[in-house]
Every structure is written in structure tokens, then in C-alpha cells.
Amino acid sequence: MRRALSLLLFALAALVGCSANVTPALGQVMLVLATDMTPGRDFDTIAVRVADPALSSELFYDWRFRAVGGGRFEGDLSLPATVAIVRQSQGTGAVTSIRVEARLAGVPRVVREARVVIPTSGVQMLRMSLDWICWDMVPAGTIGAANALACADGLACAGGECAANSADSEALATWDEAMVFGDGRASTRGDACFQVLGCFVGGFSVTPILDRQGLCSFSFDGDPERLNVAVALPVAAQRGFCAQDACLVPLDKGEASGWRAESGRVVVPRRLCTDGRQLAFSNACAPKTAAQPPCAEWSSVGLTPAANSDAVTLGLSPASAGP
């Protein structure tokens, strides 16, 4: 089931079955929570903090995830999920600070921050995905993250880089359920989600290279409309979606944390080159986008994976990154 959560007048309260067809009188920013990792294993808590100058204290809520054995996980929340941050009726339009953390054993491992102005009317969408590319890259002063890379004050990780945490409220997209929950229908259709392992079986592995312009990329002369790219991690890492011979973290086409095709090359986040990461790519499926979340038992969109991941062997063949 999808879970939509409302911060009505900045008080966190649960809602069930929130519909995109209902337009509130007051403006909202619809916060979208998503991930390319596996809740319950890669992180066990999602924490949301909202601070508004009109309030004397910070408002917050935590959701827990846990392993229950046999490779299965349970949680307080299905992902992707939405949190409606509603403008106060007497609000001044001041900047609202939003912070989302993915924690593991109490340690913040992925932290996203944004500063936005809640609109006077209508519903805008703010996507804050908890992506593996931002693992252990947190804002300076984050409590409990002593071993992480620190972004300077006013900066937070986005696409593996420290970037300004202020969002242009006027540039935020209008809320559209289909851009979060696949086809926007009830969670009974497998094509609303992305079969991570199934789409990479028989694919290729490649190590991207960093060019003089600072772009991290690899050569690709195929059809980008049939391309998918993922970070390929050792099975021992147990991050993302794991088969017998590799774990994959899928990258979304067109996102800062994902990939784009450019002049016969595929450009990916720079951090993947500086960290010496290996990639997997395949032309078996249409490209995964942010609107098509992974298929998983914790998903609010699609069905559980069709095949038992323990029985899947990707069999990736080495490819050249090109000149």
C-alpha cells in the first residue's frame, strides 16, 4: 500500500490513501522519499526533520525498518512515500528547512537537505532520494558521522557532490503522482516498477574513466533508449540489489545521481570515477527513471521480484570504457 504522510500546519500525522485529485486550500510542498538501496539492510531508519521560522521548535518523525530473516525485511513505511508539508494559514512565506536522513545502527549514512518556500497555493514536488552515491557524504556537524566525508556549511550531497542545499521553489515541478508511483495506479502492476536484477542478466561490466574536463563516462554506441546503468558492487558489500555474483545499485536516466547519454558516451556521477567504481550496463529493458521505482517487497508500487535473487547470476561480460 502507498503511504502518504501530511505535515498539516507542520504537525506530522499519518494519512492513508492520499489522492492527487484532492487539492488543498493551502499550498503544499510534496516531499518524495525514495531510495536505490534496500531498507532494513542498507539502512534501518528514515528520519525527517522540518524547521520553520514561524515555529519555536523543530518537528520530526522517524520510520524504522528491520530484517526478519530469510532475506526478508519489514518496515513502518513502504517506498516511495510522500510527505505533504502544508503552508500555515498565517504563514509569512519564510524559508523552510527540510532534512532527511537514512541511518544504520544510529549513524546517519545518507543525508539530504533542502531549503524551500512553501507556495501560497497548489502543490509542488520536492524529490529527496536517499541514494547510495551519497553514502557517508554528509553535512558538516552531523552528529554520529565521524568517519564520513563532510560537506561545508550550507552544502549537502546531491549526485555524489557537495551542492547548495537551497531549492528554487519556483522551479519545483507541479505534483504528479505518476512521476513517483510509476503509472500512478494501484500497486498491482509489475510494469510500474523496475526489475533490477532481471534487466541486467547477461549485461556488461565497465570501469568509467575521468576525462580532462572532469566528466566521468564510458563509451557506448548503442541505443540509449534501451540502456540501463548500475553501480556493480562485490557481493560482500551487501548494498543495493544482490545476485549471486554482484550487487547492483541502479542509476536513473536523466538524474544528477544517475546517467545521461552525450556524444557517444554515457556520463555518470564524478564520484564513481574518483572512487574507482565498476559499472554494469545492459540493453535488455527501457531505461529506468525516477518515476519507476525498483520492484521489491518493500515497494509501494510494484510486485516483489519475479525471481529469487539468491538464484540469479548476472554473468556480466567485461567491456571497454573507450578512449
Language model feature labels by segment:
Residues 1-323:
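Signals and flexible motifs at protein termini associated with secretion
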